[in-house]
């Protein structure tokens, strides 16, 4: 199963349109942020799962239990906190990327030509969708922490092939401390994530 496309399928065109409206950006620009953000968030999950499988399992399980996929619209409401019930995506992103998170937001902003605040909103939406999709997959397939870690590791090749053209993922992975993640899987840039 291609996890990247599974995640993208949870992002309907209407939600991308609403994100563009809320942020004042074009739909194509928001879509570009999402195309770069999803592989980056997955890279963070893959990297962390190799050293903290129980922690990552707990994160995606909490996303699934909070029904985050049914609350994505709350992530993009700029008039509310970036929080969906008790599930705070920014706490999780801080856990994944630490003090490199703001640098990631700046890189996404520069790549898509959008405001940093817009890139942050689209990243939050992408991350919430990613964790929700992974959590749903784990629950549907009765995966435990080790099973989920193995599944995430199996997605490396797909991840390497899904980076949008123009986004320097190799450099970003190094900046985020994920450089060794693709040591055996050279990054090939192409736009094959099926965002609407």
Each language-model region and where it sits:
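A structural "flexibility-hinge" signal
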Residues: 1-196
